[in-house]
């Protein structure tokens, strides 16, 4: 219901990771990475499926050994979401997972080896139509760049990225995306800004090693939010020392906050004060858990009193404004009903689910009408 944010996205080339389009105006893809041992096939498959359920577009899997590469083959056969193989140090592992149907190869230029080894990986990727992510990281810059700059700087990350972009260009390979990650927000943001001016390849965003669930989410929201608000970024990962499922949730929350891409419910809730007429915090927490399965984009405002409640409800798909014993329910800005404050959670859950079903049906009909023309 709110006005769409006027963000003009940076123009970039289109590549595909499996069936997921990246760049050239495609929806910004949200991805995560497994933290199981890849050789534990069952645990890794279960985690990937959990990530799929919360909306992951792409999942990255670390493949540190040949044994992990063999496990990757079995994992790939059991999941639907596109998989990126994360390769460090041994280029031969990249060649092996390419045989097993990997959807994208992530290589780190600082440790994958010499130009000949990179050429072998690129030739294999070209033959099998596999895109590559050049993953530059402030913590693993090439030794000569560490010596040249003394410490990670935006210029150092840019030079590392461009060195390998130029190498891929010389090999006539353009199916790649690039990241220049750092754990420092300002270093990462400025590095991406510089890179965005130099190339038109898709950019994968991330604040690497951001921290735990709370601090990492804050760092990522600031860093990725700055870049996304400037139109920079085609895919992202929120790196958290937490359950990877939380990375997907935070990633979508960032996109929802900027009104770039919505999945599920955007809850608008007051921090509460003595004026609240019902338990706002308990209601929001309960509904967030109960309604995780809803993927329909909706704005739901839950405000405990009449100070700001009616105003928020006017621009929400559904809105509740606290009142004495009963609270006003608004739908699409129009007051419809009153809900008993003592049964708020169950009543509101039912109304939200009904509204989601109605919106889904309306979209289905719209799609059918468009396809019929």
From Swiss-Prot:
Keyword Cell cycle: yes or no?
A: no
Q: What class of enzyme is it?
A: oxidoreductase
Gene Ontology molecular functions? 4 iron, 4 sulfur cluster binding; 4-hydroxy-3-methylbut-2-en-1-yl diphosphate synthase activity (ferredoxin); 4-hydroxy-3-methylbut-2-enyl-diphosphate synthase activity (flavodoxin); iron ion binding
| InterPro entries (alphabetical) | Dihydropteroate_synth-like_sf, IspG_bac, IspG_bac-typ, NO2/SO3_Rdtase_4Fe4S_sf
GO biological process terms, alphabetically, are: isopentenyl diphosphate biosynthetic process, methylerythritol 4-phosphate pathway; terpenoid biosynthetic process
**Pfam families to which the protein is assigned, alphabetical:** GcpE (PF04551)
Q: Does the keyword Isomerase apply?
A: no
Query: Which catalytic reaction applies to this protein?
Result: (2E)-4-hydroxy-3-methylbut-2-enyl diphosphate + oxidized [flavodoxin] + H2O + 2 H(+) = 2-C-methyl-D-erythritol 2,4-cyclic diphosphate + reduced [flavodoxin]
Q: How is the cofactor bound?
A: Binds 1 [4Fe-4S] cluster.
Entry binding sites for [4Fe-4S] cluster: 270, 273, 305, 312
Gene3D superfamilies, per the entry: Dihydropteroate synthase-like (3.20.20.20), Sulfite Reductase Hemoprotein, domain 1 (3.30.413.10)
Kindly state which keywords UniProt assigns to this record, in alphabetical order: 4Fe-4S, Iron, Iron-sulfur, Isoprene biosynthesis, Metal-binding, Oxidoreductase
Its biological function? Answer: Converts 2C-methyl-D-erythritol 2,4-cyclodiphosphate (ME-2,4cPP) into 1-hydroxy-2-methyl-2-(E)-butenyl 4-diphosphate.
Q: Which family does it belong to?
A: Belongs to the IspG family.
Q: What is this protein called?
A: 4-hydroxy-3-methylbut-2-en-1-yl diphosphate synthase (flavodoxin)
Gene name, Swiss-Prot/TrEMBL: ispG
